[in-house]
Amino acid sequence: MSYVDAFYESGKDTVTVVERVNGERIIKDVKPEHNFYYGDPNGKHKSIFGEPVTEVRCNSQKDFKKNLGICKHNGLYESDIRPVQKVLERDYLNIDPPKLQTAFFDIEVDFDPTRGYSTPEDAFSPITSIGIYLQWMDAMICLAVPPKTLTWEQAHEVASPLSEVKLFRTEKEMLDVFLSVIEDADVLSGWNSESYDIPYVINRIIRTMGKSETRRMCLLKKLPKERKFTLYGKETQSFDLVGRVHLDYLELYRKYNYEERHSYRLDYIGEMEVGEKKVVYEGSLDRLYNHDFLKFLEYNIQDVMLLDKMDKKLQFIDLANIIAHENTVLLPVTMGAVATTEQAIINEAHRRGMVVPDKAKGERERDTAAGAFVATPKKGYHEWVGSMDLNSLYPSVFRALNMAPETIVGQLRLDYTEEEIANAQKLEKRSFADAWHGKFGTNEFEFVK
């Protein structure tokens, strides 16, 4: 017994938990705990700072808010922990994670000669094919609408070598079957699916079938929740699913792979990890769709199979699943760092019989700067070059210090430097770190430059 997803419904004052038990999906409503603590010299509980606190237990969210108003001037503890988090910690701490049923998917989109390729936000072009791999069934399915260059009979004949292909006359029919195929999936995953496949599919469902049908992407007839985020300086649309989990495998790879890659294209990563690339073709994907439909289908299938093969090797979804259940957080929460760490601290504090204070309100966020000064760099050779770009340290070293594998011209023996450091340690009784004081590089570097 363990959870896949959970969400709080304020109208019913319940937490709905989706479980996967022995291959079966179980959905149940759980009564959440409405409790908090406040500072009290006579309190029987202790905070992580050793301060005495008193617990307040409430029967409903309404009573909870009422009591918060009464006690807020005494200093609040754990009043900002969400009901879902309280339920997961109470009911699922130290319980093994479930065996998730994962569906990898990838879409291909038509090309409009006059308007070009459409974006997920303005999904004016229809989806031409959807590849889906149901990992728990070891089943590959490719749904496709044939190009207008082929008759219905010709399309069937062309696709006949691929038993996993099912053809449709309209995009609407194809999307309807897609929603049926993923019905028993716990996790949907694609490559760059957060900013492309998920929003594109949902927006095409809205255009062809109506907004109400997007509920089938979630469970319990819930609508996907639209979310905006900034990607490469541009506001991007995505959707969060409810009851079913979406994990972008590109983001999983970025997070859990231990080294930076020069490119994060699926073609490059697939070759790096499993020795396979995308299907190679000449010209545009639109030309491939219209003039070599069989290879187009193979292209879509290979993209999805690459994801499955990489996951079988890397097991990043399993890793996210383990981290989520070790810390009693939801799977999507593991894509960040702060919320998972916070819950881990809360769980450990409770294990020690302590409670944690509410998070400080973001007063700093209200402080804004009028602007910033950017100095014009002086051309030429500079010593003592530093960089704070820790997120992209390797390329920063390229730019700032001209240090890269292709710039190596030889190696220097550090005889002079090692002798100087050794003498400073032995004769002057200085520490190793102190012996380097005032030196930016080795003596040999100074000689060569």
Protein language model features and the residues they cover:
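Common nucleic-acid-contacting/processivity interface regions adjacent to the catalytic cores
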Residues: R287-L414, E418-E419, N423
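Short secondary-structure boundary/capping segments
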Residues: T119-E121, P199-S212, A324-H325, A400-T407
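Short helix/loop capping segments that flank catalytic or ligand/cofactor-binding pockets
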Residues: D112-R115, I141-C142, I198-P199, K255-N257, ...
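Conserved catalytic core of nucleic-acid polymerases
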Residues: C71, Y77-D80, L390-L393, M403-A404, ...
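Non-catalytic nucleic-acid-binding interfaces of large nucleic-acid enzymes and RNP effectors
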Residues: M1-R82, E183, R207-D240, G275, ...
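Conserved RNase H-like, two-metal-ion catalytic cores of nucleic-acid enzymes
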Residues: Y3-K46, Q85, E89-V187
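Short glycine-rich phosphate-binding loop at a beta-alpha junction
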Residues: D186-E194
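Active-site-proximal helix-loop-helix substrate-binding element of RNase H-like nuclease domains
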Residues: A139-L143, T149-V165, R169, L188, ...
